[in-house]
Amino acid sequence: MTGHIFKLAALVGAIIVMASGVARAEEVAPPPSSATRSPELVPASFKVPVRSTGPGFKLVPLGPDLAMIDHAAYMSSIPHLQATFTRSKNWPHPGISAAEAMADMKAEQARFIARESFAYAVLTPDGKRERGCVYVSPSPVPGYDAVVRMWVTQAEYDAGFDARLQSWVMEWVRKDWPFRNVAYPGRTIPWATWETKIAATKAKSTVTTQ
């Protein structure tokens, strides 16, 4: 009986030593190498535009202070944006509350500050009305430095502002951003082509990880 007790004690001691060794190894484990991190959208030295002015409008970062006018803008154009921007019934939809709109603005602001993506409101010069939005984001498809998307309200689209905004934004990105190859889904790249590229990228990623 005593022999069994000694053996059990020795086994428990070995387990404790192994566990402490694992803990120490975890404590001193180096951070992931840069090769495993997602590439940065923009270099650390790049000064991100925080205010840009075009003919009859200005671009400013989306944030909580714009929650009300942003909400009013997209809620005025639900069918239009579902058809031309998200291509989905999920956004915008009639049930979006003011609280949800505020949470979205806080999230956009956080991503902007973290330099993960950059969302801008397209405002009238006096800042009282939102004409649309512009988004600069990482590309899910290899070969592109960034994806730029934009929308305008139904009223602005009917007035011809969409085409003018696209032309201005493409020149702004070319001159003021550090990208060489930018994707404009639904603009210079047809939606069907872009969705095919995304599907192919996901399929390739799945095969690679198996």
Show where each model-derived region lies.
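GNAT-family acyltransferases
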Residues: V28-E156, W168, W172, D176-Q210
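Boundary at the C-terminal end of the N-terminal hydrophobic targeting segment
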Residues: A23-A25
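Bacterial N-terminal signal peptides
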Residues: A9-A19
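Intrinsic disorder/low-complexity segments enriched in polar/small residues
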Residues: L8, E27-V28
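Bacterial N-terminal signal peptides that target proteins for export
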Residues: M1-A10
